[in-house]
Amino acid sequence: MPADMKVLHEREFSEVWLRDYTDEPYFRIYHTLEKVEATNLDEYRVETAVVSDIPRIVRIINDSYANISVTCDQIREYTKTEVYQPALWIKAVHCANGKIVGCGMADFDSEMQEGIIEWIQVLPEYRGKKIGQMLVNELLLRMKPMARFATVSGQVNNLSSPEKLYRKCGFVGNDIWHILTKKT
């Protein structure tokens, strides 16, 4: 971790830190995997993503965020990690035209038996159609045979309110972490 950063749990955090640091709070919530239901949508289907989908996945990620930009090389590097599981990289495909309109990427930590949702993206023009919910629930169903539980984290102040999506899919908890960056 860079010397100008600190990560504090909510229990350790106080407003005093804000004199010298900027704060970006993140939620971290979990799912027991006991009750997971598929979200079936007539117009969209889920498929396992393959390495040749990476350029399209990168476009979806970059088109979904104003402040994040990833490259194909960065995403390919994820496939070389110990927690990479090919079955946990999925895409939402429009049935009528075959267009990839969303994607989901998750990891599996075999030591902890934990499924970790890393990315859920839906192109802005396709949001509000339950595609995100379909992707999250599909990942949870795929994790269920291998994991004891699943986790996800995200920015508390994200304008797209990802925490609401995850809670609709059965995630619970109230863990908040603060990423503090030294003011210059």
Each language-model region and where it sits:
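Acyl-donor-binding surface of acyltransferase catalytic domains
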Residues: 1-42, 178-182
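Conserved GNAT acetyl-CoA-binding A-motif
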Residues: 1-7, 143-155
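A short beta-loop-alpha structural element at the N-terminal edge
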Residues: 44-59
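Hydrophobic adenine-recognition pocket in adenosine-nucleotide-binding enzymes
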Residues: 49, 120-122, 155-156
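A conserved beta-strand-loop-helix scaffold within acyl/acetyltransferase catalytic domains
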Residues: 67-122
